[in-house]
């Protein structure tokens, strides 16, 4: 919808812990979480100034990311909605999808897209929002507001390419009898694709 599209740049700019170092304007450097930084670079490529967007949406309250809940949330006074309070949420797609009231066919389509991203070793994030109409509701715990339901803004797949020298280094370790394991917070599908790219996973491999 138009509302979903118009709020997306503000959601990315406001609900993040990352910054961009733009001293070299041709090659901005991400400061902070690289996945969050990739989203800032994406809206920058759409000709949005993330700092202007961030400054125009004052933060009311914020819920930091945690590995338990797998999302972060920021309640802002939205410039895009004439000062209304909007709660932006960003995190693991499987968590956010469960918090959105979606038709079955739409949920299935997003699930297929998510699987495609993960099978290509992409990091995945979902974004959603909740408009907080009542001043009283603004005082509620953010977790409670989130449980009231979200409007899905979209799912992002972000590629983090394997460095070219890694497969050869892995092979040298294996030839020397050194066991190599992948430890990651990503999904098993993403981990398997990364393992395939660096030579740790083949057709005969098992979980």
Mark where each language-model region is.
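Glycine-rich, often acidic-flanked micro-motifs
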Residues: 176
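Conserved RecA-like helicase motor-core motifs
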Residues: 201-207
